[in-house]
Amino acid sequence: MRAGLAAAGVAVALWTAAAAAQDLEPRAYSNAPVGLNFLVAGYGHTRGEVAFDTAVPIEDASLTVHSAFLAYARAIDVWGRGGKIEVVLPYAWLSGTAAVNGVQTERDVSGFGDPRVRVSVLFYGGPALSMAEFQDYRADLIIGASLGVSIPLGQYDASKLANIGTHRWAVKPELGISKTLGPWTVELATSATFYTVNDDFFGGRVLKRDPLFAAQAHAIYHTRFGLWAALDATYYMGGRTTIDGEPGERGENVRVGATLAIPVTRHHSVKLYGSIGAVARTGGSFDTAGIAW
C-alpha cells in the first residue's frame, strides 16, 4: 500500500470533521413560517496547510478541497414552537501533497461525504406561525436547540486511508440564542460533537476521537431590501484522535469569517461566504470560500 494514502485519508477526515463541527453558519436560530421549504445547492473551495497530531506520521501537508452540497430544509411545528428539519448531502474532491514518514507523496480522491441530518426547535421567542401570521412577527430574543447527526454512508474503503466518509457516526447537540437590536442580530451558539469508534480503520487499526467542543458568534446586519451580511467567529477545542491506543494532541483553534446574502427574486437568493484560520494549535491553517443558491 502506498504511503501517500495516509496524507489524503487523514486530510479527508479533517475536512469532514470541519464541515460537521466547525461550521460558521449565521441565522441558524431564526424563525420561519411553518411549511416553508428551502432547497440549497452550493460549492466551496478550501486550501491551506494542515498540521497533524503526533498520532499521524505526516508533515508539510498542503491540501486543496473542492466540495459541493445539496441541502433541503423545511420549517415545522414542534408542539407549538417553530422548528426546522434539514438534510445535507456533500460531495468532495481532494488533492494534496505531504511527507509521510519522510517520503514526499501526493494523492487525489473524490466521493460522497457522510450525509447530515439536523433538527432544531425554538423554545423561546419563536412560535410556530402560518404564512399569514408570520407577516406580523417581529423577532426579539430567541432561544433554541438543535441535534445534528452525521450518518456513515459516505465513500469508504477499509483497505485505504483515502476516504471521504468517516465510517463512524457523529452526534452534535447545540444550544443557540439570538437577540435582535434594530437592524442588527447577535447570535451565539455552543455545541459538542460526539463520535463513535471506527473499528475498521486502515490496517485493522481502531480509531477513536474525543468530543469536540465549539462556540460560535455572529453579528448580522439586515437591510429592508432583504440583503444581510454577517461577521462570524468560532472557537473549538478537544477532538483528540487516538489510533490503537496512541493519543494525539488536543485541538484548539479559532476561525473568523464573513457571510453575504443577496436576494435575487422573492424566492431565490445567493449567499457568499468565506473564513480563515486565525489561531491553529492543530488542524492547520486553511482558507475557505464558497457560494450557495
Question: Where on the chain are the PLM-derived regions?
Answer:
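Surface-exposed strand-loop-strand hairpins of Gram-negative outer-membrane beta-barrel proteins
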Residues: 46-67, 104-105, 158-165
